[in-house]
Design a protein with these regions (language model features):
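N-terminal membrane-proximal hinge/A-helix region immediately C-terminal to the signal-anchor transmembrane segment
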Residues: 1-32, 36, 40-41, 45, ...
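Classical protein tyrosine phosphatase
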Residues: 1-3, 7-9, 105-112, 206-231, ...
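Cytochrome P450 heme-thiolate monooxygenase catalytic core
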Residues: 18-27, 60-212, 246
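Cytochrome P450 heme-thiolate "Cys pocket" and heme-binding signature region
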Residues: 52, 247, 324-355, 379-382, ...
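Conserved cytochrome P450 K-helix E-x-x-R motif and the immediately C-terminal K′/meander segment
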Residues: 152, 156, 242-285, 298, ...
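Cytochrome P450 heme-binding "Cys pocket" and the immediately downstream C-terminal segment
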Residues: 223-225, 348-385
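Conserved cytochrome P450 K-helix/beta-meander segment immediately N-terminal to the heme-binding cysteine loop
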Residues: 299-327
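C-terminal helix/juxtamembrane-tail motif
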Residues: 384-398
């Protein structure tokens, strides 16, 4: 445990530490020949295409879409009221993700169906799934049905786009996935395209909605920090309500560090898993250990990022720990909010962009106070770790 011991985990190649076997339980959700079920060559093509779709040139086109979706959603709040913040931000993050990743046609015409099917896919992932992915349960039955229907939906979208290519602006990732050709010359199938879209949504949805919820709660709970965040927003955007630009989001350093700190204290995944494909030597605190071939290797962001040796006063929410001169995250393999090394999350730039744009609008336009005193507990009993219980807040338009 700790940065030194974790170095071998995050520097290892797939030939040394494999993800495929330990995440095999996701195959019924993602589908065959998708991500970890694909051959190594095809998986590289899929991952490279994902990475291309999340580069700066495309991210620049997403800011206006995320802001527009956020403002449309918040119109329904009115001047004041109460809401479960986690539920609200979960709805908002999937709206913005669908607009950016799936495209305008999906968001406009079939979003409700996609959202309902995603719900059944998500709830088809239970603790039992890890050990028995195809157990004859109601959750798994709904999961399998939802995936079949999701493929049918996107098959129609793909056919429409092939017939009428001008209807898409080409900035969404679905457009990129449709163009995938593997090194053997074969073309990607609609089933695989759907699986990649599901995988991308799975990877980002929980992290974005949970981190935006925790960030909102932590910042709103500390009035002096909230004042600083709003001051930063005013310095970047001014008092006018001009549209947010990509360059504006890049300047939101304090808000960035607030999200980063929320993920340090409350990471969405307790464990990251690998299977040792060969014996591996690990050094820690002057000692050397051997991880035998065949063992399951685990790194826990939850434990590692609360180590006082790496992050002093680890139980204190302190976004300034990332700013100069402290920069406590700079030590390699210490900050694991988005994994690390060769398999660090390729969607982290999109996640920061999405959450910062949403919170820029939300925190400038609303005062938020949690109805119950203090901060919620962390729900460690869940597969994906978020706030425990409800997150009901009172809001008042500023």
């Amino acid at each position: 445990m700790g940065p030194e011991a974790q170095e071998v985990f995050f520097k290892a190649t797939d030939d040394q530490l494999s993800q495929a076997e330990v995440y095999d339980f996701m195959r019924p959700v993602f589908g065959k020949n998708v991500v970890y079920d694909a051959s190594k060559k095809n998986r590289q093509v899929q991952f490279q295409t994902m990475a291309n779709g999340l580069r700066t040139a495309r991210l620049k086109a997403y800011v206006s879409k995320i802001e527009e979706e956020t403002r449309m959603y918040l119109k329904n709040w009115g001047e004041s009221g109460e809401v479960d913040l986690l539920t609200a931000l979960s709805e908002l993050t999937i709206l913005t993700a669908s607009r950016c990743l799936h495209g305008e046609d999906v968001r406009t015409h079939i979003f409700k169906e996609v959202q309902e099917l995603y719900h059944d896919l998500d709830h088809g992932l239970t603790p039992l799934t890890v050990f028995w992915p195809n157990a004859p349960t109601e959750a798994h039955r709904k999961r399998n049905k939802a995936r079949t229907e999701m493929v049918e939906l996107f098959q129609k979208v793909i056919k429409e786009r092939e017939l009428y290519p001008d209807r898409s602006d080409g900035t969404d990732i679905l457009s990129l996935f449709m163009q995938i050709k593997y090194k053997d010359g074969s073309k990607i199938t609609a089933d695989q395209v759907t699986g990649l879209l599901i995988a991308l949504l799975f990877a980002g949805q929980h992290t974005s909605c949970i981190s935006s919820t925790w960030t909102s709660l932590f910042v709103s709970h500390d009035k002096s920090l909230l004042d600083r965040v709003r001051k930063e927003q005013d310095e970047i955007l001014g008092k006018s309500k001009r549209p947010i630009q990509f360059e504006d989001v890049q300047k939101m350093d304090l808000l960035h560090n607030c999200m980063r700190e929320a993920l340090r204290m409350c990471p969405t995944f307790i464990m990251i898993l690998r299977k040792a494909e060969q014996d591996l030597k690990v050094k820690s605190e002057g000692k050397t250990f051997i991880i035998p071939k065949g063992d399951i290797v685990v790194v826990s962001p939850t434990v590692s990022m609360r180590m006082k040796e790496t992050f002093p006063n680890p139980d204190t929410y302190d976004p300034d720990r990332y700013a100069a001169p402290r920069e406590e995250h700079k030590k390699p393999y210490s900050y694991l909010g988005f994994g690390g090394g060769v398999h660090s999350c390729m969607g982290q730039n999109f996640a920061f962009l999405q959450v910062k744009t949403i919170l820029s609008v939300l925190l400038r336009e609303y005062d938020i106070d949690r109805i119950e005193p203090g901060m919620p507990d962390i729900g460690y009993e869940d597969m994906v770790v978020g706030p425990k219980g409800n997150c009901r807040v009172k809001y008042q338009k500023r």
